[in-house]
């Protein structure tokens, strides 16, 4: 194993100006560069500067927090410069710290630092940002778990917040961040209001008809189509480009390099053009010459269900529609907006809403952060309520894996948490040998094989059967060997690639160039965190390397695990369609959930397949667990041992025992005592004890809980004391375990309580009584059929020593419970469906046997079900009685 530094590269120069600084939190690395350029510009005329410049400077100089809500193109980012001048002065020293540009010796002198959400969360977590600092949150509406943690940690540190947002309802942020004012600005020009139409279709290809495209060509329009998936962007661009060669078509999504959009961003794209993009791709891009927007009314978002994030297809919210339409609505003369939806959307009535938060779906990140700081999740004022069940589940998992102990990170946990990777990859890096570091680090740098490749990929020569991880590794290794080499970016070593060669390589294989470049960036960051030199080349995948990788996974197992498409808790999970793993066997990797067309959450997994013998070797063998099996009458006390692997039971062995294992003698006595208390023990005193227990429980109810309760827990403790010194099952069978009722209630008290009436006479018939405790009050319930309910008179009821309640039996239907006859009649007259919806019905069979003393059989004066028969003939008979009667009829002897 290698030594893991406990200080990340971003914190190796922790100093800061004495008077505080401005920390700008950007959503992406690209946004960091944009903000850095914007802070360096002066004298730029913008909508915000023209309409609210003096107001922004006044608020910035007063020291209070505030927000700016404005649409795209109004100059939100450029407003950071005048804000900084009011707070830190005109001598601005600005720098960027992110995964690409680490901290330098000059970092402590910067009075304006631009960081990504991950760096900001780390600095807040380690107290490198204090109350003297001001946080500017750019694009705060782009919610993420990291950003939401930054907001909570910033509030805990006492920081001042200035936030910039696109068109959303600002009421939440105003209250949550204690903002003095919110400046709202818009570049909307009523004279340039777009024509907005809703097309009754959700298929963009159906909408892009010949008529529409001829309209685009005739007017030489610039069209942007926003769709929810990467595949849709490529499909649209391909379909239109093949049919209409006079329309310049292009697509863009998160897997493509930003250089692909250069003609559109710089106004060099020839009209007419059509650009298909994912909704996420449109956020901070100003496309020149755009006058037509087509919006597919769909988005894939993570919805938290039962503590797990489920990828769900939902209609777009008002915020998303307004932001996309705002590209042309009120900004471009003759603009057109088309919304492809089967819903009825009244565009003029759409109003901004509060953003959707993501933190509830990442309880593990919250647990690690809180453990590092030594605080509880309750101590953080999170912007969204945390799923407590999922949070506690994450804490237990982290404790079991040795990362958390006593609500603090262990030494192992600190090594894992400091690395710039997710927790599973951090564990693998900490526990791997140095020769496997290149494999682990690169696999950690690639999001997934599915996100790395297109649907029509051609990667057969690189497939490592049974491992998506190693297949992705092999693709990067080949790209580096053929298209790249060692280089330097911002003075830091990194794998760099020839753009043209890499583009051709990716096009030939169906691999996304952006994923390769992002992997190179992440790989360099990981090696800097490990303080290891970045290798010039990577070893190819061979059988020994594959076996070492599998052994590491089997030994550490930080991922989800599925065996034969089933989880340890019995949930069915399918192998991902794009995975190179087989359906059967052991697969370890990332388990993701998605919502199918019926709304049901389904799981899929991709990762690496492991041989059974590897997990067998790594499985834990329990020393044996004492169990009590009532199904084994001769020897119910048994010793069970099992071979388990992270929740899966691979094998088990069970054998009968007589002598108690010395280290489990107390557990054996507890199990036997529990069996005696529940009445399932095979002991000579068990039968008589069951009768006494039933009587003691009835006495407890009749006494109004004045006597000692004979619950299962109390009886278990009683028999544990009686079994003290017993060391084998044979001694247990010989022990005197007859229940002494006098220890629970004196004999005279038991006799008095059992003399209380067990039945009540109403209208000449007797009905059973049930004694009970309800809301701390002793009551007695009369069980009567529904037809008797309407014959009773409240004034003619006998006096009882406690309140009389009613249970009305209604044949095969659910019974009714009421505190009075009037209430019982009112409930009985209401529709059953209404009572069921209000939870006023109880399952209580009409043939329930009453306490001892209650008369059984048909009531006096009422015929039995056997019409015309004698009363004795209508009663049930035993099989032995019927057999003797048949024998007599045949002339046999009795």
Language model segments and positions:
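Charge-dense polyanion-binding interfaces
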Residues: 136-138, 247-252, 257-263, 428-452, ...
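Acidic, serine/threonine- and proline-rich low-complexity intrinsically disordered segments
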Residues: 439-572, 578, 583-754, 796-875, ...
